[in-house]
Amino acid sequence: VSVDCSDYPMPACTMEYRPVCGSDNKTYGNKCNFCNAVVESNGTLTLSHFGKC
């Protein structure tokens, strides 16, 4: 399972709710929020699965 984060980070994310679960066992509201967190983690954060953790 993977998600393309090549277009990120973005300065602002929409409020669209399409949850994804990160390898940190945290639920991110959408791909944008998740990808921004991936960038901030220097690539150590990965996608666990789509949907809530």
UniProtKB/Swiss-Prot annotation:
The GO terms describing molecular function are:
serine-type endopeptidase inhibitor activity
Q: Where's it found, cell-wise?
A: Secreted
Query: What Pfam families does its record include?
Result: Kazal_1
Q: Which cysteines are joined by disulfide bonds?
A: C5-C35, C13-C32, C21-C53
SUPFAM superfamilies attached to this UniProt entry: Kazal-type serine protease inhibitors
In terms of superkingdom, the source organism counts as Eukaryota
Q: What is its main location?
A: secreted
Sorted keywords for this record are: Disulfide bond, Glycoprotein, Protease inhibitor, Repeat, Secreted, Serine protease inhibitor
Residues modified by carbohydrate are: N42
**Any idea where the Kazal-like domain is?**
3-53
Q: Name one GO cellular component term.
A: extracellular region
Site feature location: Reactive bond 3? M15, E16
Show the domain comment. Answer: Avian ovomucoid consists of three homologous, tandem Kazal family inhibitory domains.
Entries under PANTHER family matching the protein: OVOMUCOID-LIKE-RELATED, SERINE PEPTIDASE INHIBITOR, KAZAL TYPE 2, TANDEM DUPLICATE 1-RELATED
User: What is this protein's name?
Assistant: Ovomucoid
Q: Which organism is it from?
A: Arborophila torqueola (Hill partridge)
Q: From which lineage does this chain's organism come? A: Eukaryota, Metazoa, Chordata, Craniata, Vertebrata
